[in-house]
Amino acid sequence: MKIANFEVGNGKPFFLMSGPCVIESEQMAMDTAGYLAEVTKDLGINFVYKSSFDKANRSSINSFRGLGVDKGLEILAKVKKTYNVPVVTDVHEDTPFAEVAEVVDVLQTPAFLCRQTNFILEVCKQGKPVNIKKGQFLAPWDMQHVVTKAKSTGNEQIMVCERGVSFGYNNLVSDMRSLEIMKATGCPVVFDATHSVQLPGGQGSSSGGQREFVPVLSKAAMAVGIDGLFMETHPNPDEAKSDGLNSFPMYKIKEFLSLLKELDHLVKSQPKTEL
């Protein structure tokens, strides 16, 4: 499949989805998109800018959710035009899907909603590439049912994304077998390195996170031969309005992406060991 002007999957080099969890302001969106676009261009990594206009699943009613669909889409359109990069954003059950699909290049469905059949069908009917996040409660092989629903719309541009599985209360673990298992869906496989280190509800009224484990999980996922890496970034994670504790510090990303590119090339240049 293709996102904008580049191929995804089938042994192609990994692509990056990255940006702040939520659009905090137009200036911040432009600054982060510009920096990430420059870094990925220098490294030769295909890049999709990610940020959300609405975080509908925040832990607390008092948490910052975003700037709303109208302002959010206006900013994403400006990012896309200014830096010539594709953009991805989350959609929810009450999102005006067609309006969003006119602006973004990829629609992303939240993990919590992966079993909502009507929601998945309506999103996929927009005809855009869709990144479907696997629920924290779902076995990797059960994503085949989700993919079958999605493709029943005639949309073949479907990706599946691992973002950790619930491990008791307020904790997630990443089962790297999941990445290999989900390849059986025939869809490109994406690893969400930052939400995988989230501690859901771990701060009482908000989620905690262990960003120090983002590098090790990202490298482990590269060893599996993933097609895409999802990694939320922020100029100052400790001041982020959403998911700061599991966000990657943006100004440290270039050196790390360079390492991941080397790992990706090494893994995909080797024959697969069959047992």
UniProtKB/Swiss-Prot annotation:
GO MF, one example: 3-deoxy-8-phosphooctulonate synthase activity
Involved pathway(s): Carbohydrate biosynthesis; 3-deoxy-D-manno-octulosonate biosynthesis; 3-deoxy-D-manno-octulosonate from D-ribulose 5-phosphate: step 2/3; Bacterial outer membrane biogenesis; lipopolysaccharide biosynthesis
GO CC aspect terms: cytoplasm
Compartments in which it is found: Cytoplasm
InterPro entries with a match to the protein in the record: Aldolase_TIM, DAHP1/KDSA, KDO8P_synthase
PANTHER family associated with the record: PHOSPHO-2-DEHYDRO-3-DEOXYHEPTONATE ALDOLASE
Family recorded in the similarity comment: Belongs to the KdsA family.
Entry protein name: 2-dehydro-3-deoxyphosphooctonate aldolase
High-level lineage: Bacteria, Pseudomonadati, Pseudomonadota, Gammaproteobacteria, Thiotrichales
